Structure formats: C-alpha cells, structure tokens
Amino acid sequence: MHVLFVERHGLEETEVPVDLDHQPADLVILSFSDSDLGAFAAGWQRAKTQNEHDFPSIRLANLASLKHPISVDTYIEKTLRHASGILIRLIGGVPYWSYGLNQVAQIAKRHNIAFAVIPADGRSDKQLDEISSVPVSTLRRLQHLCEIGGEVAAHSALAQLALAAGLYASPVSGSKMIGNVGAWTPEHNLCCPFIARGFDPKPLILITFYRSFITAADLKPISALF
C-alpha cells in the first residue's frame, strides 16, 4: 500500500504522518512510554533466553508516532490487523488517542483479536474497560504487571496477553515484585544488599541509581560500570 503524504489542514496540525513499516507479529504493544516498551523488549528477550522458542513474536511502537490518522490507518493495515493480541497502555484516557482507539477496537472486533487497553496512571478507567475485548479480570492482571515494571513482570504480561489471544505461553518463573530499595549486580540481578556485598574483603564502590532503571529494564549503562 502506498501512502501519499501531503499538506493537510484540520488533522492534528502539529503532527506529520509516519509509516512505521512494522512487519506483522503475534502480539503488538503500544505505549507513550519508552520505559514501558523497553521493559517489554527485555521481557520478550527473557522468554527467548529461557528456551521458549515458540514464544509469540512481538512488535513495539510508541503512540507518539501514531498521532496522525493516516499513521494510525497505515499501522492498522500493515501490522495490527494481522495480530492475535494487542495491548495499549494509555495515559490520559480515551481523549488522548480517541481516533486510534476507535479504529483499533473496530479492527479487533472484525478479526477477533484479543484487545486490551489499560491506564498508565494507576487509576481505573471504565471507558477503557468497555473498549477492550478481553475480560476485566485479564485487564486488571495486565495493569498490575505493567505497574510493577521490570523484565519479569513484562514477560508475565506478554504471557498473559498470549493466553488471552489463544496462543501458548509457558508459566513465568522468577519474582515479579521490585522493592522500593535494594541491590542489583550483573551476577545476582535483584538481590539483598548483603548478598551483593558478599564476602570479598576487597573494598567496594557503591553505585546509586534510580529504581526506574530496573522497572524499564534499562540496566546496560549500570552493568557497564562493573
């Protein structure tokens, strides 16, 4: 399909149409947060490293790239309509992406796609529940896992979405919870500070970093310091 990008008036005046050109996948995750998308990428990679070779394929996209109606229509045509499950984590409710939600809901109903829309601000939203096609109990589990953050919770959320879409996903092992404080090392991952300290008599340097590095599974900069 060819998309002609021309000057337009009245349609998201500050936005320019974008063709993400994503190939179809089993599951598609959309969010305005790069931290969300980074965690889901790490969660999917975790599934693969645990020899889940048949784990569903995924595509990740930032909703900031899908603000223009042409961008939405193109992404639906190329990617979303071929998916088995779609998860959207939205901040601000329906008004922040009303055209996209309406169009994706229609395509999900037409193609029997498991469609979940969850709020990213920690509050319940009945409008998003009504737009979604999966049970409210599934929405709450997905919301809880996304609010926890980190690669294990993201792995679990992907598995939950896969099951809702009728795809196979193995049970997810490992602790999903992330404490408000704690320790992390490349060797032990999340752990008790006493374990991180170990019994090595050599002096150690304490590196302090934000918890959000863990919830976004963005630990490469920290790991590089070890």
Language-model region placement:
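An N-terminal assembly and electron-transfer interface module characteristic of large anaerobic redox
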Residues: 1-226
